[in-house]
Regions:
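Basic, polar low-complexity surface loops/patches
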Residues: 1-91
């Protein structure tokens, strides 16, 4: 799976946010964000995936955005062309 420097940078510093990266195939959540999201949606499936940086990353993919954003609506949210950032979910 392709992982960009943007994703690696965001997730390497992430302690309390959920970053949902917008891939053509659909939304994907990596590493710390995947762990945070699993807390709110234990029914989601987290995988360990070998990515383009030759490392294994925790990944949740194939999620539906609407129920996730509805459930996390009480948290501030930033929307970008490449990702959605839900802030402060684990403070």
């Amino acid at each position: 799976m392709e992982i960009t420097d943007l994703i690696i940078g965001k997730e390497s510093e992430n302690i309390s946010d959920i970053y949902i990266f917008l891939y053509e195939e659909g939304p994907v959540v990596f590493d710390a964000s995947a762990v945070h999201l699993l807390f709110y949606f234990p029914e989601m499936e987290m995988e360990s995936v070998l990515c383009s940086d030759r490392r294994r990353h925790r990944v949740i993919r194939g999620l539906a955005l609407e129920p996730v954003l509805e459930r996390l609506a009480q948290y501030p949210c930033l929307v970008d062309d490449e990702y959605i950032r839900v802030m402060g979910v684990c403070e």
